[in-house]
Amino acid sequence: MSYLIVGASSGLGRELAYVFAGKGNSIIISSRDAKDLDAIKSDITNKFKNVSVQTLPADLNSPEDFINNLKIKGKGFSDIEGAIFPVGGMFDEDGIYLENDKVEKILKINFSSITLIISELSKAFNDNGKGLVIGFGSVSGLLGRKFNSHYAASKRALESYFESLAASQSNDKIKIQFYILGYLETNLSFGKNLKLPKGSPKKLAELVYKKKNINFKKIYFPFWWGLIAFLLKIIPINFLIKLIKNSKS
């Protein structure tokens, strides 16, 4: 049985690949870049002997192709024990008036393609009587914003979807988990002047592995974002909208 890790070529996805393989688990690692995947596979198999690593070069902009290729790798999904989606994509110019084709790409990568893949996998998990699905949102989705508007909206939609996914499970052996992420030490945040400290992808990957068998829970990382989320919920929305209008981000 294998764990599917989508977006495994860098950042959190890469760290998850190393953590899960380091614990002796077989993994299927996926991203758009076949060369990056091959390099990671070679390094992991050198570090951790007798661990199976398969690569799945695929693009979430083509979810049907992704699913068909995954069926081949995962023997019709019957060989997949869990699916982890540390993926996300955005455009620097993302705002309400972003071009339609870019909006479509943002929604696919951050939301709709993920739900299509999970829908297919869920059938296999129900047949097997067990499974694991882990999704990752963003603190960007806590509140509407002038910039990264569609990215934030898609991450909020994904959070709602995972709540529905958890509510739909009648088998407690199918675990659904969702992490809401603040800033991490990745290439996406490199060089940015951020007001809050960045979290470690490696520490997060270790936390994900440690908590993979718990029942549904939304986990904020770094943890202090949970307090910020609580405060945003109790502040009147009209006041928050005024702040957003007057802000530069």
Where are the model-predicted features located?
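Conserved glycine-rich cofactor-binding loop
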Residues: S9-S10
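Conserved glycine-rich Rossmann-like NAD(P)H-binding loop of the short-chain dehydrogenase/reductase
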Residues: K23-I40
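Active-site helix of classical SDR
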Residues: I118, S154
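Residue(s) in the substrate-gating loop at a strand-loop-helix junction
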Residues: S138
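C-terminal helical subdomain
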Residues: F178-Y179, N193-F230
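Rossmann-fold cofactor-recognition segment
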Residues: K47-E64
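Conserved mid-core segment of classical short-chain dehydrogenase/reductases
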Residues: I67, K75, G82, G88-E104, ...
